[in-house]
Amino acid sequence: MTERELWERYQRYLCVVPALDFTLDVSRMRFPADYLERMRPRLEEAFGAMEALEKGAVANPDEKRKVGHYWLRAPELAPEPALQKEITDTVAAIHAFAKNVHEGRVKPQKAQRFTHMLIVGIGGSALGPQLVADALGTAKDPMQVSFFDNTDPDGFDRVLAQLGERLSETLTLVISKSGGTKETRNGMLEAERGYSARGLDFSKHAVAVTGAGSELDNHAKKQGWLRAFPMWDWVGGRTSVTSAVGLLPARLQGLDIDALLKGARDMDAATRERDALKNPAALLALMWHYAGDGRGHKDMVILPYKDRLLLMSRYLQQLVMESLGKETDLDGQVVNQGIAVYGNKGSTDQHAYVQQLREGVLNFFATFIEVLKDRDGGSQEVEPGVTSGDYLLGFLLGTRRALYEKDRESLTLTVPDVSARTLGALIALYERAVGFYATLVHINAYHQPGVEAGKKAAGVVLELQRKLTTRLREARAEARTAEQLAADIGMPDEVETVFKVLQHLAANPDRGVTRTPGATPTQARFQAK
Protein backbone atom coordinates (compact mmCIF):
# COMPACT_ATOMS: atom_id res chain seq x y z
CA MET A 1 0.00 0.00 0.00
CA THR A 2 1.07 3.58 -0.58
CA GLU A 3 1.38 5.96 2.36
CA ARG A 4 -1.86 7.65 1.22
CA GLU A 5 -3.66 4.28 1.16
CA LEU A 6 -2.34 3.47 4.61
CA TRP A 7 -3.65 6.82 5.86
CA GLU A 8 -7.08 5.98 4.49
CA ARG A 9 -6.93 2.55 6.14
CA TYR A 10 -5.80 4.18 9.39
CA GLN A 11 -8.87 6.43 9.42
CA ARG A 12 -11.26 3.63 8.44
CA TYR A 13 -10.22 1.23 11.19
CA LEU A 14 -9.09 3.56 13.99
CA CYS A 15 -10.82 2.65 17.26
CA VAL A 16 -11.26 5.69 19.51
CA VAL A 17 -12.26 5.77 23.18
CA PRO A 18 -12.97 9.48 23.77
CA ALA A 19 -13.64 9.12 27.51
CA LEU A 20 -10.10 7.84 28.04
CA ASP A 21 -8.27 9.50 25.14
CA PHE A 22 -7.23 6.01 23.97
CA THR A 23 -6.87 4.92 20.36
CA LEU A 24 -6.18 1.51 18.85
CA ASP A 25 -4.74 1.50 15.32
CA VAL A 26 -5.07 -1.80 13.44
CA SER A 27 -4.20 -0.42 10.00
CA ARG A 28 -0.91 -2.35 9.88
CA MET A 29 -2.72 -5.67 10.29
CA ARG A 30 -3.45 -7.09 6.83
CA PHE A 31 -6.89 -8.57 7.54
CA PRO A 32 -9.23 -8.64 4.50
CA ALA A 33 -12.05 -6.14 4.13
CA ASP A 34 -14.74 -8.68 5.02
CA TYR A 35 -12.97 -10.11 8.09
CA LEU A 36 -14.78 -8.13 10.78
CA GLU A 37 -18.16 -8.91 9.22
CA ARG A 38 -17.34 -12.62 8.95
CA MET A 39 -16.39 -12.69 12.62
CA ARG A 40 -19.50 -10.85 13.79
CA PRO A 41 -21.54 -13.95 14.83
CA ARG A 42 -18.68 -15.28 16.94
CA LEU A 43 -18.06 -11.87 18.42
CA GLU A 44 -21.74 -11.60 19.36
CA GLU A 45 -21.32 -14.87 21.24
CA ALA A 46 -18.32 -13.35 23.06
CA PHE A 47 -20.34 -10.27 24.00
CA GLY A 48 -23.07 -12.51 25.35
CA ALA A 49 -20.61 -14.56 27.40
CA MET A 50 -19.06 -11.42 28.87
CA GLU A 51 -22.48 -10.01 29.76
CA ALA A 52 -23.45 -13.27 31.48
CA LEU A 53 -20.13 -13.34 33.36
CA GLU A 54 -20.68 -9.81 34.66
CA LYS A 55 -24.18 -10.77 35.83
CA GLY A 56 -22.80 -13.62 37.92
CA ALA A 57 -23.04 -16.69 35.70
CA VAL A 58 -20.54 -19.49 36.33
CA ALA A 59 -17.80 -18.56 33.85
CA ASN A 60 -15.21 -21.05 35.11
CA PRO A 61 -17.03 -24.36 34.57
CA ASP A 62 -14.04 -26.56 35.43
CA GLU A 63 -13.92 -25.16 38.97
CA LYS A 64 -17.62 -24.22 39.04
CA ARG A 65 -16.81 -20.63 39.96
CA LYS A 66 -18.15 -17.22 39.13
CA VAL A 67 -15.62 -14.73 37.77
CA GLY A 68 -16.08 -11.31 39.32
CA HIS A 69 -13.04 -9.10 38.86
CA TYR A 70 -15.14 -6.56 36.93
CA TRP A 71 -17.30 -6.10 40.04
CA LEU A 72 -14.25 -4.79 41.90
CA ARG A 73 -14.42 -1.45 40.08
CA ALA A 74 -18.21 -1.42 39.74
CA PRO A 75 -19.57 -3.04 42.92
CA GLU A 76 -23.14 -2.37 41.83
CA LEU A 77 -22.67 -5.10 39.19
CA ALA A 78 -22.11 -7.78 41.84
CA PRO A 79 -25.13 -10.10 41.87
CA GLU A 80 -25.67 -9.98 45.64
CA PRO A 81 -25.92 -6.97 47.99
CA ALA A 82 -23.59 -8.69 50.47
CA LEU A 83 -20.86 -8.89 47.82
CA GLN A 84 -21.35 -5.25 46.89
CA LYS A 85 -20.86 -4.29 50.52
CA GLU A 86 -17.77 -6.48 50.93
CA ILE A 87 -16.14 -4.81 47.93
CA THR A 88 -16.87 -1.23 49.02
CA ASP A 89 -15.99 -1.98 52.65
CA THR A 90 -12.64 -3.45 51.60
CA VAL A 91 -11.68 -0.36 49.57
CA ALA A 92 -12.68 1.86 52.50
CA ALA A 93 -10.64 -0.30 54.88
CA ILE A 94 -7.61 -0.05 52.58
CA HIS A 95 -7.85 3.75 52.57
CA ALA A 96 -8.22 3.87 56.35
CA PHE A 97 -5.35 1.46 57.03
CA ALA A 98 -2.97 3.27 54.67
CA LYS A 99 -3.86 6.62 56.25
CA ASN A 100 -3.11 5.22 59.70
CA VAL A 101 0.22 3.85 58.48
CA HIS A 102 1.25 7.09 56.78
CA GLU A 103 0.29 9.18 59.82
CA GLY A 104 2.10 6.89 62.26
CA ARG A 105 -0.90 5.52 64.12
CA VAL A 106 -0.02 2.05 62.85
CA LYS A 107 3.71 1.97 63.48
CA PRO A 108 6.57 -0.53 63.61
CA GLN A 109 7.93 -2.10 66.77
CA LYS A 110 11.12 -0.04 67.09
CA ALA A 111 10.71 2.90 64.71
CA GLN A 112 8.50 5.94 64.41
CA ARG A 113 7.00 5.15 61.03
CA PHE A 114 6.83 2.58 58.25
CA THR A 115 8.85 3.90 55.29
CA HIS A 116 9.27 0.69 53.27
CA MET A 117 7.10 -2.19 52.17
CA LEU A 118 8.10 -5.78 51.39
CA ILE A 119 5.59 -7.68 49.28
CA VAL A 120 5.76 -11.47 49.51
CA GLY A 121 3.85 -13.16 46.69
CA ILE A 122 4.20 -14.92 43.37
CA GLY A 123 2.38 -14.95 40.04
CA GLY A 124 -0.58 -12.60 40.07
CA SER A 125 0.14 -11.76 43.70
CA ALA A 126 3.38 -10.10 42.57
CA LEU A 127 3.25 -9.29 38.85
CA GLY A 128 0.30 -6.90 39.14
CA PRO A 129 1.66 -5.03 42.17
CA GLN A 130 5.10 -4.87 40.51
CA LEU A 131 3.63 -3.34 37.35
CA VAL A 132 1.67 -0.73 39.30
CA ALA A 133 4.57 0.13 41.62
CA ASP A 134 7.07 0.52 38.79
CA ALA A 135 4.75 2.38 36.43
CA LEU A 136 3.45 4.91 38.95
CA GLY A 137 6.08 5.10 41.68
CA THR A 138 8.35 8.06 42.43
CA ALA A 139 11.23 8.77 44.80
CA LYS A 140 8.83 10.88 46.89
CA ASP A 141 6.39 8.06 47.67
CA PRO A 142 5.69 7.68 51.40
CA MET A 143 6.73 4.03 51.19
CA GLN A 144 9.24 2.41 48.85
CA VAL A 145 8.57 -1.14 47.67
CA SER A 146 10.59 -4.37 47.51
CA PHE A 147 9.47 -7.88 46.53
CA PHE A 148 10.00 -11.51 47.43
CA ASP A 149 8.50 -13.08 44.29
CA ASN A 150 10.28 -16.43 44.11
CA THR A 151 11.71 -19.11 46.37
CA ASP A 152 15.35 -18.30 45.54
CA PRO A 153 17.48 -18.16 48.73
CA ASP A 154 19.98 -15.75 47.20
CA GLY A 155 17.09 -13.55 46.06
CA PHE A 156 15.82 -13.34 49.63
CA ASP A 157 19.30 -12.44 50.87
CA ARG A 158 19.75 -9.70 48.26
CA VAL A 159 16.48 -7.97 49.16
CA LEU A 160 17.12 -8.21 52.90
CA ALA A 161 20.65 -6.84 52.40
CA GLN A 162 19.28 -3.94 50.36
CA LEU A 163 16.78 -3.13 53.11
CA GLY A 164 19.45 -3.44 55.80
CA GLU A 165 18.62 -1.45 58.92
CA ARG A 166 15.49 -0.13 57.21
CA LEU A 167 13.89 -3.51 57.85
CA SER A 168 12.82 -2.05 61.20
CA GLU A 169 10.73 0.46 59.19
CA THR A 170 9.41 -2.12 56.73
CA LEU A 171 5.82 -3.36 56.57
CA THR A 172 5.57 -6.84 55.03
CA LEU A 173 2.52 -7.83 52.99
CA VAL A 174 2.11 -11.57 52.50
CA ILE A 175 -0.24 -12.19 49.58
CA SER A 176 -1.69 -15.61 48.74
CA LYS A 177 -5.25 -16.35 47.69
CA SER A 178 -5.15 -19.97 48.78
CA GLY A 179 -2.89 -19.25 51.71
CA GLY A 180 -0.94 -22.40 50.94
CA THR A 181 1.34 -21.36 48.06
CA LYS A 182 4.73 -22.82 48.93
CA GLU A 183 6.85 -20.09 47.35
CA THR A 184 4.96 -17.47 49.36
CA ARG A 185 5.13 -19.57 52.53
CA ASN A 186 8.89 -19.85 52.05
CA GLY A 187 9.19 -16.10 51.51
CA MET A 188 7.21 -15.44 54.67
CA LEU A 189 9.50 -17.72 56.70
CA GLU A 190 12.61 -16.09 55.21
CA ALA A 191 11.20 -12.66 56.07
CA GLU A 192 10.48 -13.82 59.62
CA ARG A 193 14.09 -14.96 59.88
CA GLY A 194 15.30 -11.56 58.67
CA TYR A 195 13.24 -9.67 61.22
CA SER A 196 14.24 -12.03 64.02
CA ALA A 197 17.94 -11.58 63.20
CA ARG A 198 17.49 -7.88 63.93
CA GLY A 199 15.62 -8.46 67.16
CA LEU A 200 12.24 -7.63 65.65
CA ASP A 201 8.86 -9.31 66.10
CA PHE A 202 7.61 -10.16 62.61
CA SER A 203 3.96 -10.09 63.67
CA LYS A 204 4.24 -6.38 64.49
CA HIS A 205 5.27 -5.70 60.88
CA ALA A 206 3.03 -8.12 58.97
CA VAL A 207 -0.23 -7.92 57.02
CA ALA A 208 -1.96 -10.74 55.13
CA VAL A 209 -3.99 -10.59 51.94
CA THR A 210 -5.67 -13.97 51.60
CA GLY A 211 -8.89 -15.93 51.51
CA ALA A 212 -10.95 -16.02 54.69
CA GLY A 213 -10.18 -19.15 56.69
CA SER A 214 -7.10 -20.03 54.62
CA GLU A 215 -3.93 -21.44 56.14
CA LEU A 216 -2.35 -17.98 55.92
CA ASP A 217 -5.41 -16.27 57.38
CA ASN A 218 -5.42 -18.62 60.36
CA HIS A 219 -1.66 -18.19 60.85
CA ALA A 220 -1.95 -14.39 60.78
CA LYS A 221 -4.72 -14.41 63.36
CA LYS A 222 -2.90 -16.86 65.62
CA GLN A 223 0.31 -14.82 65.49
CA GLY A 224 -1.47 -11.49 65.98
CA TRP A 225 -0.50 -9.81 62.72
CA LEU A 226 -1.44 -6.17 62.21
CA ARG A 227 -4.26 -6.85 59.79
CA ALA A 228 -5.71 -9.22 57.18
CA PHE A 229 -7.49 -8.16 53.99
CA PRO A 230 -9.71 -10.48 51.94
CA MET A 231 -9.31 -12.27 48.64
CA TRP A 232 -12.39 -13.93 47.20
CA ASP A 233 -12.62 -17.21 45.29
CA TRP A 234 -14.31 -15.38 42.40
CA VAL A 235 -11.17 -13.30 41.73
CA GLY A 236 -8.27 -15.05 39.99
CA GLY A 237 -4.69 -14.16 40.83
CA ARG A 238 -3.91 -12.85 37.35
CA THR A 239 -6.98 -10.57 37.42
CA SER A 240 -6.57 -9.39 41.01
CA VAL A 241 -4.90 -5.99 40.52
CA THR A 242 -8.10 -4.11 41.37
CA SER A 243 -8.65 -6.21 44.52
CA ALA A 244 -6.76 -5.81 47.80
CA VAL A 245 -3.87 -7.65 46.09
CA GLY A 246 -3.08 -4.57 44.01
CA LEU A 247 -4.94 -1.80 45.81
CA LEU A 248 -3.42 -2.24 49.27
CA PRO A 249 0.24 -2.02 48.19
CA ALA A 250 -0.56 0.80 45.78
CA ARG A 251 -2.38 2.85 48.43
CA LEU A 252 0.41 2.25 50.95
CA GLN A 253 2.90 3.41 48.31
CA GLY A 254 0.89 6.62 48.08
CA LEU A 255 -0.71 6.02 44.69
CA ASP A 256 -4.19 7.12 43.64
CA ILE A 257 -6.16 3.87 43.76
CA ASP A 258 -9.46 5.65 43.14
CA ALA A 259 -8.09 6.83 39.78
CA LEU A 260 -6.80 3.32 39.05
CA LEU A 261 -10.28 1.92 39.72
CA LYS A 262 -11.92 4.66 37.67
CA GLY A 263 -9.70 3.95 34.68
CA ALA A 264 -10.57 0.26 34.84
CA ARG A 265 -14.26 1.04 35.30
CA ASP A 266 -14.28 3.44 32.34
CA MET A 267 -12.55 0.90 30.10
CA ASP A 268 -15.00 -1.80 31.20
CA ALA A 269 -17.84 0.52 30.17
CA ALA A 270 -16.23 1.35 26.83
CA THR A 271 -15.73 -2.33 26.03
CA ARG A 272 -19.40 -3.19 26.49
CA GLU A 273 -20.00 -1.49 23.14
CA ARG A 274 -21.06 -4.10 20.57
CA ASP A 275 -19.52 -2.39 17.54
CA ALA A 276 -16.02 -3.83 17.25
CA LEU A 277 -14.63 -0.63 15.75
CA LYS A 278 -15.73 1.24 18.88
CA ASN A 279 -14.64 -1.46 21.32
CA PRO A 280 -10.84 -1.72 21.68
CA ALA A 281 -10.92 -4.99 23.66
CA ALA A 282 -13.10 -6.71 21.06
CA LEU A 283 -10.94 -5.34 18.26
CA LEU A 284 -7.78 -6.54 20.01
CA ALA A 285 -9.25 -10.02 20.39
CA LEU A 286 -10.22 -10.10 16.72
CA MET A 287 -6.72 -9.03 15.67
CA TRP A 288 -5.16 -11.74 17.86
CA HIS A 289 -7.50 -14.25 16.25
CA TYR A 290 -6.66 -13.04 12.75
CA ALA A 291 -2.89 -12.93 13.36
CA GLY A 292 -2.65 -16.50 14.63
CA ASP A 293 -5.52 -18.07 12.65
CA GLY A 294 -7.35 -18.61 15.93
CA ARG A 295 -4.65 -21.11 16.97
CA GLY A 296 -1.94 -18.85 18.38
CA HIS A 297 0.37 -19.47 15.45
CA LYS A 298 2.08 -16.10 15.99
CA ASP A 299 3.66 -14.67 19.14
CA MET A 300 2.56 -11.37 20.63
CA VAL A 301 5.47 -8.93 21.01
CA ILE A 302 4.74 -6.05 23.40
CA LEU A 303 6.73 -2.88 22.65
CA PRO A 304 5.87 -0.04 25.06
CA TYR A 305 7.84 3.09 24.22
CA LYS A 306 7.99 4.21 27.83
CA ASP A 307 10.32 3.12 30.63
CA ARG A 308 7.45 3.11 33.13
CA LEU A 309 5.73 0.38 31.13
CA LEU A 310 8.76 -1.93 31.06
CA LEU A 311 6.94 -4.56 33.13
CA MET A 312 3.85 -4.56 30.92
CA SER A 313 5.11 -7.50 28.88
CA ARG A 314 5.82 -9.57 32.02
CA TYR A 315 2.39 -8.78 33.39
CA LEU A 316 0.75 -9.68 30.08
CA GLN A 317 2.74 -12.91 29.84
CA GLN A 318 0.82 -14.25 32.80
CA LEU A 319 -2.53 -12.68 31.95
CA VAL A 320 -2.52 -13.90 28.35
CA MET A 321 -0.55 -17.14 28.54
CA GLU A 322 -2.04 -18.53 31.75
CA SER A 323 -5.54 -17.62 30.55
CA LEU A 324 -5.29 -18.79 26.95
CA GLY A 325 -2.70 -21.57 27.11
CA LYS A 326 -5.09 -24.53 27.37
CA GLU A 327 -4.88 -28.13 26.22
CA THR A 328 -8.62 -28.67 25.78
CA ASP A 329 -11.61 -26.55 24.82
CA LEU A 330 -14.93 -26.27 26.65
CA ASP A 331 -16.10 -29.50 24.99
CA GLY A 332 -13.06 -31.45 26.17
CA GLN A 333 -11.49 -31.60 22.71
CA VAL A 334 -7.69 -31.31 22.53
CA VAL A 335 -6.87 -27.96 20.92
CA ASN A 336 -3.56 -26.83 22.51
CA GLN A 337 -4.47 -23.16 22.43
CA GLY A 338 -2.39 -20.19 23.51
CA ILE A 339 -0.49 -17.07 22.47
CA ALA A 340 3.14 -16.62 23.50
CA VAL A 341 3.95 -13.13 24.82
CA TYR A 342 7.30 -11.41 25.18
CA GLY A 343 8.72 -7.91 25.00
CA ASN A 344 10.85 -5.28 26.63
CA LYS A 345 10.63 -1.54 25.92
CA GLY A 346 11.34 0.81 23.07
CA SER A 347 13.74 1.94 21.89
CA THR A 348 15.85 -0.60 23.80
CA ASP A 349 14.26 -3.35 21.71
CA GLN A 350 15.56 -1.67 18.57
CA HIS A 351 19.08 -2.46 19.77
CA ALA A 352 18.19 -6.00 20.83
CA TYR A 353 15.75 -8.21 18.92
CA VAL A 354 14.06 -5.92 16.37
CA GLN A 355 16.71 -7.13 13.89
CA GLN A 356 15.11 -10.57 13.98
CA LEU A 357 11.59 -9.15 13.97
CA ARG A 358 12.30 -7.37 10.71
CA GLU A 359 14.42 -9.95 8.90
CA GLY A 360 14.07 -13.28 10.68
CA VAL A 361 11.31 -15.82 11.22
CA LEU A 362 7.87 -14.33 10.60
CA ASN A 363 6.19 -15.85 13.65
CA PHE A 364 4.88 -12.80 15.51
CA PHE A 365 2.80 -9.66 15.46
CA ALA A 366 3.83 -6.56 17.41
CA THR A 367 1.90 -4.24 19.68
CA PHE A 368 3.38 -0.76 19.99
CA ILE A 369 2.27 1.24 23.03
CA GLU A 370 2.67 4.96 22.41
CA VAL A 371 2.49 7.41 25.32
CA LEU A 372 1.81 10.98 24.21
CA LYS A 373 3.06 12.81 27.31
CA ASP A 374 6.85 12.85 27.54
CA ARG A 375 7.36 13.98 31.13
CA ASP A 376 6.19 16.34 33.83
CA GLY A 377 7.52 19.77 32.87
CA GLY A 378 9.32 20.89 29.76
CA SER A 379 12.07 19.17 27.78
CA GLN A 380 15.38 20.53 26.61
CA GLU A 381 16.30 20.34 22.95
CA VAL A 382 18.95 17.76 22.15
CA GLU A 383 19.16 19.18 18.63
CA PRO A 384 17.59 22.36 17.27
CA GLY A 385 13.81 21.88 17.55
CA VAL A 386 14.13 18.25 18.69
CA THR A 387 13.81 16.70 22.17
CA SER A 388 14.66 13.23 23.46
CA GLY A 389 10.92 12.52 23.45
CA ASP A 390 10.77 13.41 19.76
CA TYR A 391 13.45 10.81 19.16
CA LEU A 392 11.43 8.22 21.09
CA LEU A 393 8.41 8.82 18.85
CA GLY A 394 10.64 8.78 15.79
CA PHE A 395 12.02 5.38 16.73
CA LEU A 396 8.52 4.01 17.36
CA LEU A 397 7.19 5.18 14.01
CA GLY A 398 10.39 4.20 12.25
CA THR A 399 10.35 0.67 13.66
CA ARG A 400 6.65 0.32 12.82
CA ARG A 401 7.37 1.32 9.22
CA ALA A 402 10.47 -0.88 8.96
CA LEU A 403 8.45 -3.90 10.11
CA TYR A 404 5.56 -3.20 7.77
CA GLU A 405 7.90 -2.92 4.79
CA LYS A 406 8.83 -6.56 5.44
CA ASP A 407 5.20 -7.70 5.86
CA ARG A 408 5.49 -7.75 9.64
CA GLU A 409 2.13 -6.81 11.12
CA SER A 410 1.55 -4.57 14.12
CA LEU A 411 -1.02 -2.85 16.30
CA THR A 412 -0.49 0.56 17.86
CA LEU A 413 -2.15 1.50 21.12
CA THR A 414 -1.91 5.22 21.94
CA VAL A 415 -2.53 6.51 25.47
CA PRO A 416 -2.28 10.04 26.85
CA ASP A 417 0.12 9.40 29.75
CA VAL A 418 1.19 6.91 32.38
CA SER A 419 -1.16 7.86 35.19
CA ALA A 420 -3.16 5.75 37.62
CA ARG A 421 -6.29 6.16 35.52
CA THR A 422 -4.52 5.24 32.28
CA LEU A 423 -2.85 2.20 33.85
CA GLY A 424 -6.17 1.00 35.26
CA ALA A 425 -7.68 1.32 31.80
CA LEU A 426 -4.80 -0.59 30.18
CA ILE A 427 -5.16 -3.43 32.67
CA ALA A 428 -8.91 -3.62 32.08
CA LEU A 429 -8.44 -3.47 28.31
CA TYR A 430 -6.29 -6.59 28.27
CA GLU A 431 -8.41 -8.42 30.85
CA ARG A 432 -11.45 -8.00 28.63
CA ALA A 433 -9.59 -8.76 25.39
CA VAL A 434 -8.50 -12.07 26.94
CA GLY A 435 -12.10 -12.83 27.90
CA PHE A 436 -13.39 -12.10 24.41
CA TYR A 437 -10.63 -14.12 22.73
CA ALA A 438 -11.29 -17.11 24.98
CA THR A 439 -14.89 -17.23 23.79
CA LEU A 440 -13.80 -16.86 20.15
CA VAL A 441 -11.67 -20.01 20.50
CA HIS A 442 -14.07 -21.79 22.91
CA ILE A 443 -11.83 -22.26 25.95
CA ASN A 444 -11.98 -21.59 29.69
CA ALA A 445 -9.78 -18.55 30.38
CA TYR A 446 -10.22 -18.69 34.14
CA HIS A 447 -8.51 -21.86 35.35
CA GLN A 448 -4.90 -23.08 35.22
CA PRO A 449 -4.61 -26.88 35.44
CA GLY A 450 -1.07 -26.83 34.06
CA VAL A 451 0.12 -24.76 37.01
CA GLU A 452 -1.37 -27.26 39.43
CA ALA A 453 0.36 -30.12 37.58
CA GLY A 454 3.73 -28.44 38.09
CA LYS A 455 3.06 -27.99 41.81
CA LYS A 456 2.19 -31.67 42.19
CA ALA A 457 5.34 -32.72 40.33
CA ALA A 458 7.45 -30.52 42.62
CA GLY A 459 5.88 -32.25 45.61
CA VAL A 460 7.00 -35.62 44.24
CA VAL A 461 10.58 -34.35 43.92
CA LEU A 462 10.63 -33.11 47.52
CA GLU A 463 9.27 -36.42 48.80
CA LEU A 464 12.01 -38.21 46.85
CA GLN A 465 14.56 -35.91 48.49
CA ARG A 466 13.28 -36.83 51.96
CA LYS A 467 13.72 -40.52 51.17
CA LEU A 468 17.23 -39.87 49.83
CA THR A 469 18.42 -37.95 52.87
CA THR A 470 17.04 -40.64 55.16
CA ARG A 471 18.89 -43.33 53.17
CA LEU A 472 22.13 -41.33 53.18
CA ARG A 473 22.01 -40.97 56.95
CA GLU A 474 21.41 -44.71 57.30
CA ALA A 475 24.42 -45.50 55.09
CA ARG A 476 26.62 -42.71 56.47
CA ALA A 477 29.95 -44.44 55.92
CA GLU A 478 29.25 -45.65 52.39
CA ALA A 479 29.51 -43.47 49.29
CA ARG A 480 27.00 -44.50 46.64
CA THR A 481 26.13 -43.50 43.08
CA ALA A 482 22.82 -42.00 42.02
CA GLU A 483 21.93 -45.33 40.36
CA GLN A 484 22.53 -47.20 43.62
CA LEU A 485 20.64 -44.70 45.75
CA ALA A 486 17.69 -44.65 43.35
CA ALA A 487 17.46 -48.43 43.72
CA ASP A 488 17.89 -48.15 47.50
CA ILE A 489 14.79 -45.97 47.85
CA GLY A 490 12.74 -48.10 45.48
CA MET A 491 12.67 -45.56 42.65
CA PRO A 492 15.16 -46.89 40.05
CA ASP A 493 13.38 -45.20 37.15
CA GLU A 494 13.78 -41.80 38.82
CA VAL A 495 17.57 -41.95 38.70
CA GLU A 496 17.92 -38.66 36.80
CA THR A 497 15.86 -36.81 39.40
CA VAL A 498 17.85 -38.54 42.16
CA PHE A 499 21.10 -37.38 40.52
CA LYS A 500 19.89 -33.77 40.22
CA VAL A 501 18.74 -33.67 43.84
CA LEU A 502 22.05 -35.12 45.08
CA GLN A 503 24.01 -32.68 42.94
CA HIS A 504 22.09 -29.77 44.49
CA LEU A 505 22.50 -31.01 48.06
CA ALA A 506 26.23 -31.56 47.62
CA ALA A 507 26.73 -28.05 46.22
CA ASN A 508 25.42 -26.50 49.44
CA PRO A 509 27.75 -27.29 52.38
CA ASP A 510 25.06 -26.88 55.04
CA ARG A 511 22.97 -29.72 53.57
CA GLY A 512 25.21 -32.48 54.94
CA VAL A 513 26.02 -34.31 51.67
CA THR A 514 29.44 -34.74 50.09
CA ARG A 515 30.27 -35.67 46.50
CA THR A 516 33.25 -37.72 45.31
CA PRO A 517 33.90 -37.33 41.55
CA GLY A 518 33.65 -40.39 39.31
CA ALA A 519 34.94 -41.16 35.82
CA THR A 520 31.97 -39.17 34.51
CA PRO A 521 29.74 -36.67 36.34
CA THR A 522 26.92 -39.20 36.59
CA GLN A 523 29.23 -41.78 38.21
CA ALA A 524 29.98 -39.49 41.16
CA ARG A 525 29.41 -40.96 44.61
CA PHE A 526 27.50 -39.27 47.41
CA GLN A 527 27.43 -39.78 51.15
CA ALA A 528 26.30 -38.05 54.32
CA LYS A 529 28.91 -36.02 56.16
From Swiss-Prot:
Metabolic or biological pathway, per its Swiss-Prot or TrEMBL entry: Carbohydrate biosynthesis; gluconeogenesis; Carbohydrate degradation; glycolysis; D-glyceraldehyde 3-phosphate and glycerone phosphate from D-glucose: step 2/4
Entries under PROSITE patterns matching the protein: P_GLUCOSE_ISOMERASE_2, P_GLUCOSE_ISOMERASE_3
Region (Disordered): 510-529
The keyword Isomerase is annotated on this UniProt entry: yes
Catalytic activity: alpha-D-glucose 6-phosphate = beta-D-fructose 6-phosphate
Any one annotated GO CC term: cytosol
Class in the EC hierarchy, top level: isomerase
Catalytic residues of the enzyme: E322 (proton donor), H351, K455
Pfam families with a match to the protein in the record: PGI
Polar residues compositional bias, start-end: 517-529
Subcellular location: Cytoplasm
EC number: 5.3.1.9
UniProt record, GO biological process: gluconeogenesis; glucose 6-phosphate metabolic process; glycolytic process
Highest taxon, organism lineage: Bacteria
Main localization of the protein described in the UniProt heading: cytoplasm
Molecular-function GO term, any one: carbohydrate derivative binding
Keywords: Cytoplasm, Gluconeogenesis, Glycolysis, Isomerase
Role of this protein: Catalyzes the reversible isomerization of glucose-6-phosphate to fructose-6-phosphate.
Similarity annotation: Belongs to the GPI family.
Protein name: Glucose-6-phosphate isomerase
